[in-house]
Amino acid sequence: MSSKVTRKIYFCGSIRGGREDAALYKRIIDQLQSYGEVLTEHVGDLEAQEEELGETCDDYYIHERDINWLFSSDAVVAEVTQPSLGVGYELGRALEHKKNVLCLYRPQPGKRLSAMIKGAENGKNFFVKEYKEEDVPDLLMNFFTSL
């Protein structure tokens, strides 16, 4: 009898930087669940309590918990439209540990994606894709089938 190993996916999205896109995060996370276990599904939980989002936890605890999840993941998917220092930090650590990363960015008038994210794209394990929400299924399929 063989056991199936489930892919672990770390999803990044703004929490303290703004929750305007939480509903979108939830829809992306719902799609990601068909590719594996999403370790950070609380990021898209519209009804998450402060404790679940880490608002009432010690900052050290949140950092250690999330970094452990990040390092144990097989792939990282980040929605980077809403600027977030935390997401940028997570992506830097993911790149440092040679994780497979897909960044999703919705172009908006008068706003540009940080060069530190866009410039990290290497065509090997770090990808940045401009998208509309209807593009997400194909972008995820292409990313995960290439791993």
Curated annotation (Swiss-Prot):
Keywords: Cytoplasm, Glycosidase, Hydrolase, Nucleotide metabolism, Nucleus. GO terms for biological process: deoxyribonucleoside monophosphate catabolic process; nucleoside metabolic process; nucleotide metabolic process; positive regulation of cell growth. GO terms for molecular function: 5-hydroxymethyl-dUMP N-hydrolase activity. GO terms for cellular component: cytoplasm; nucleus. Its EC number is 3.2.2.-. Pfam families: Nuc_deoxyrib_tr. It is found in: Cytoplasm; Nucleus. HAMAP family: Nuc_phosphate_hydrolase. Catalyzes the cleavage of the N-glycosidic bond of deoxyribonucleoside 5'-monophosphates to yield deoxyribose 5-phosphate and a purine or pyrimidine base. Monomer and homodimer. PANTHER family: 2'-DEOXYNUCLEOSIDE 5'-PHOSPHATE N-HYDROLASE 1. Belongs to the 2'-deoxynucleoside 5'-phosphate N-hydrolase 1 family. This is Putative 2'-deoxynucleoside 5'-phosphate N-hydrolase 1. The lineage of its organism: Eukaryota, Metazoa, Cnidaria, Anthozoa, Hexacorallia.
